[in-house]
């Protein structure tokens, strides 16, 4: 539930980083001198470990060690259950100490995926996504690790999963590993009211997650400032939804 962008401005480094983050937007393109067609600017965020803090306390994406979020929902494949646990583990990525979040999914009671995601927050309050180690299962056996990636390895680059000061219309890269992981996010609204099994939440942030390489990814996510995390995921088209049922 990667719950899976445009906000830095206090120094020259941060201003440059902002341009990198926005490289997926129309303002981040340039003309190809030979063809005359727009050419997407290179995405290359500059990461300085000194710009990061130890605590992740963004109001929409708060990762306190020990917290556990449980989600359930109906998908085209059946009933899904997801457990997201903020561990007390850390991983060093590009010199940054990232918090390890374990995301485990079951379909019709059978384990289908076990993932460790790596997140870190910068001084401005942006939450960065530095990669994941994922395993897909069939009949309790690992059948694939496709989708695993680590920022700084094989030209993979981190992205922002939650900006410090989200604004409607912001568009940002959540991850970048060319041809493997290229999820994007758009800020749709800041004032949504959402009702799920766990309760009713107001002033939720709504995002649209999509991918340039994975056309099946097209979903809305709703983040509650009261919970500090995702409370609902649902397909942009269709009836599939996965919602928060418990917080421990």
Residues of each region from the PLM?
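Bacterial N-terminal signal peptides that target proteins for export
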Residues: 2-12
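C-terminal motif of bacterial Sec signal peptides marking the signal peptidase cleavage site
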Residues: 21-24
């Amino acid at each position: 539930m990667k719950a899976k962008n445009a906000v830095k401005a206090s120094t020259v480094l941060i201003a440059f980083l902002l341009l990198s983050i926005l490289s997926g937007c129309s303002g981040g393109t340039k003309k190809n001198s030979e063809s005359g067609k727009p050419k997407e600017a290179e995405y290359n965020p500059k990461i300085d470990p000194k710009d990061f803090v130890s605590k992740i306390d963004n109001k929409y994406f708060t990762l306190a060690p020990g917290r556990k979020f449980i989600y359930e929902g109906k998908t085209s494949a059946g009933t899904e259950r997801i457990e997201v646990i903020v561990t007390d583990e850390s991983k060093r990525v590009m010199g940054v100490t990232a918090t390890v979040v374990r995301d485990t999914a079951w379909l019709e009671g059978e384990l289908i995926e076990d993932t460790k995601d790596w997140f870190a927050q910068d001084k401005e309050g942006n939450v960065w996504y530095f990669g994941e180690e994922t395993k897909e299962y069939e009949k309790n056996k690992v059948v694939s690790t496709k989708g695993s990636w680590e920022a700084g390895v094989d030209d993979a680059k981190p992205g922002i999963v939650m900006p410090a000061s989200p604004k409607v219309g912001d568009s940002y890269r959540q991850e970048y590993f060319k041809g493997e992981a290229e999820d994007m996010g758009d800020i749709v609204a800041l004032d949504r009211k959402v009702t799920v099994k766990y309760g009713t939440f107001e002033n939720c942030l709504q995002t649209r997650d999509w991918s340039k390489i994975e056309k099946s990814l097209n979903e809305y996510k709703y983040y509650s400032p009261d919970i500090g995390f995702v409370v609902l995921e649902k397909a942009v088209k269709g009836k599939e939804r996965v919602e928060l049922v418990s917080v421990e």
